[in-house]
């Protein structure tokens, strides 16, 4: 990410490390929050951190869905957490969450998905600097995947396109993987109060 989550934790007195496998994202985070700690590494590499390092690990927004081998992810996190430590993961109801990006949703407190027969999957934004952004969320439940296709049209006429492949099994499947590895489900937090409908935080604990 760009360092916002680790900065928020730091502001509340929690010292942490931001992990990303993209050097560009690490550099961007350092530009924005130069006093915080970051590590270039892969969550799927068990050697990224030493065993029993952390009291808490967070996996927020759609990070978990970029990870295909979720069993390896949970195994590594189990190793890196201290006994009794917590993992917080952000999951969505894949069939009902709103895939419209926040900047493209004209309804701040009302989900337009509740007032249409067909799920809205397109985002269109024109920024103040003249850049136009389009995105489309394509969902393939038969193989537990989704694709987010993005197009950036800049003021000078240049166009950049990119695709994000997401691996989206059901919440039940993901949580079952975690439980089979040994995590205990401690709490489920509905994110509707912060305008993320059909999205949840799950607090999992490593046994003592």
Regions found by a protein language model. Give the residues of each.
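SAM-dependent methyltransferase
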Residues: 91-172
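A cross-domain feature marking catalytic cores of carbohydrate-active enzymes
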Residues: 61, 89-91
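A short SAM/SAH-binding and catalytic strip from SAM-dependent methyltransferases
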Residues: 55-69
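C-terminal lobe and adjacent flexible extensions of AdoMet/dcAdoMet transferase-like proteins
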Residues: 165-208
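A short glycine-rich, Lys/Arg-flanked "PGG" loop and its adjoining helix->strand segment in the class I
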Residues: 71-86
């Amino acid at each position: 990410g760009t360092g916002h989550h680790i900065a928020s934790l730091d502001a509340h007195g929690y010292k942490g490390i931001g992990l990303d496998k993209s050097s560009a994202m690490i550099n961007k985070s350092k530009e924005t929050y130069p006093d915080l700690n970051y590590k270039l590494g892969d969550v799927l590499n068990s050697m990224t951190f030493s065993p029993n390092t952390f009291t808490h690990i967070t996996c927020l927004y759609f990070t978990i869905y970029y990870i295909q081998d979720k069993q390896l992810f949970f195994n590594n996190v189990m190793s890196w957490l201290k006994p009794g430590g917590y993992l917080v993961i952000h999951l969505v109801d894949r069939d009902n969450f709103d895939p419209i990006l926040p900047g493209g949703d004209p309804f701040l407190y009302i989900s337009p998905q509740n007032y249409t027969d067909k799920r809205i999957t397109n985002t269109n934004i024109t920024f103040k600097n003249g850049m136009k952004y389009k995105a489309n969320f394509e969902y393939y439940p038969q193989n537990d995947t989704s694709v987010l296709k993005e197009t950036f049209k800049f003021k000078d006429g240049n166009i950049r396109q990119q695709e994000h492949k997401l691996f989206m099994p059901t919440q039940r499947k993901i949580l079952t993987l975690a439980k089979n590895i040994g995590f205990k489900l401690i709490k489920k937090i509905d994110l509707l109060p912060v305008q993320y409908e059909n999205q949840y935080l799950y607090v999992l604990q490593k046994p003592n």
